[in-house]
């Protein structure tokens, strides 16, 4: 890698108290090197080569997702999550960062530097890529809502406000009967009072006439939140926007997440059965990589050639998702990473199951999708009283 040996040599003897400066130097070297992350020279002029519309960022649709344990008759643990997601259209041909808004182009270069194989063959006919931007909030509370002191044997009050940026690559290996979706998502945000979790919960509880939680003064303290998620999913290769008629399929996957939001490795499988199952990579609760809305070269056929056998069609299916993960860090259980705080004895192994139904249809020439699921999660810490359950609703619209 160009220049990295020199950077590492220059960091010899750097004090331990300066890790952020060291990381900044390395990232800057990756982002601003005259050799880009894709192995070719980058134009640094004010007038980059002409960019076609297919190589520029255009928005394809969005998703609003709400998760809450009130759907399952409880009010504790992971108690609420909301996320608003925007998804781009497919970027055709080889990826050109200079054709993208600067922050997104820089992130594409950073991924190519940190994971050189991710953009390999990005211009091949058997691969495509798109971008997902997500803004969301999550909140966690103990079981006892009336106590105003720290509850040592229950999870801390915690909130997270975040912005996520994900690149998705859909790949069909040559002559293979399967296809893959690779995801690289960077999440940045804030933990603590600045997440506005207390205010959000109080607003909802007042509107519904529910007693408010009294212990938010003991929530985790403010600190920056970050996480890098790397995920791969795979399923049988299918042409078109749906699998026509009645059918079923299986989606497998594995992921690694690193950061002070969560550090964990997971693997899972999803089973789907129904009518006109969409040619995507499944339905999941809120987490990095979940709102993948993968690239789909046939999306435009909805309006240009609606009678094509490849075009999107109404349909519905049921799904069952099973996932297991090994957890090394979870801010909602381990507390603040950069200062002492309330925490509990986290379990290193967690399993999760989700059962739901998803339907898609065409309204006024626009694609609409609604997915509803119930999620069960095993105990996450020693003192937890049994498993936890919550409901999830997601409404998606294609522009």
Describe every region a protein language model picked out.
Residues 41-59, 90-129, 171-183, 236-250, ...:
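Short loop/turn motifs that connect adjacent beta-strands in outer-membrane beta-barrel proteins
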Residues 105, 143-145, 270, 275-399:
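Outer membrane beta-barrel transmembrane domains
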Residues 148-152, 212-218, 255, 339-344, ...:
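Extracellular loop and loop/strand-boundary signature of outer-membrane beta-barrel proteins
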């Amino acid at each position: 890698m160009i220049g990295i040996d020199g950077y590492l040599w220059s960091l010899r003897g750097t004090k331990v108290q300066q890790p952020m400066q060291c990381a900044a130097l390395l990232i800057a070297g990756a982002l601003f090197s005259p050799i880009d992350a894709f192995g070719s020279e980058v134009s640094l002029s004010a007038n980059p080569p002409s960019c076609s519309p297919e190589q520029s960022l255009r928005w394809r649709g969005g998703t609003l997702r709400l998760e809450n344990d009130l759907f399952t008759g409880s009010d504790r643990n992971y108690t609420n999550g909301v996320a608003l997601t925007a998804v781009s259209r497919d970027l055709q041909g080889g990826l050109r960062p200079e054709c993208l808004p600067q922050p997104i182009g820089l992130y594409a270069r950073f991924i190519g530097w940190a994971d050189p194989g991710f953009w390999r063959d990005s211009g091949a006919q058997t691969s495509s890529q798109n971008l997902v931007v997500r803004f969301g909030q999550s909140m966690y509370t103990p079981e006892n809502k009336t106590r105003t002191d720290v509850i040592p044997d229950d999870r801390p009050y915690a909130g997270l406000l975040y912005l996520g940026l994900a690149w998705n690559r859909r790949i069909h290996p040559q002559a293979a009967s399967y296809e893959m979706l690779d995801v690289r998502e960077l999440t940045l945000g804030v933990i603590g009072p600045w997440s506005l979790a207390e205010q959000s919960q109080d607003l909802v509880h007042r509107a519904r006439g529910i007693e408010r939680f009294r212990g938010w003064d003991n929530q985790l303290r403010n600190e920056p939140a970050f996480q890098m998620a790397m995920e791969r999913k795979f399923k049988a290769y299918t042409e078109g926007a749906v699998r026509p008629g009645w059918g079923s399929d299986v989606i497998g996957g594995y992921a690694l997440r690193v950061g002070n939001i969560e550090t964990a490795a997971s693997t899972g499988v999803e089973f789907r059965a129904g009518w006109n199952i969409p040619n995507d990579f499944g339905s999941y609760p809120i987490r990095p990589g979940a709102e993948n809305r993968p690239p789909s070269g046939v999306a435009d056929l909805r309006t240009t050639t609606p009678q094509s056998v490849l075009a999107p069609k109404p349909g519905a299916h049921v799904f069952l998702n099973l996932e297991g993960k090994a957890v090394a860090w979870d801010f909602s259980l381990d507390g603040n990473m950069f200062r002492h705080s309330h925490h509990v004895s986290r379990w290193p192994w967690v399993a999760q199951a989700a059962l739901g139904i998803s339907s898609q249809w065409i309204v006024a020439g626009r694609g609409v999708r609604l997915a509803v699921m119930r999620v069960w999660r095993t105990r996450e810490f020693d003192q937890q009283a049994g498993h936890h359950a919550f409901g999830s609703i997601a409404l998606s619209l294609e522009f």
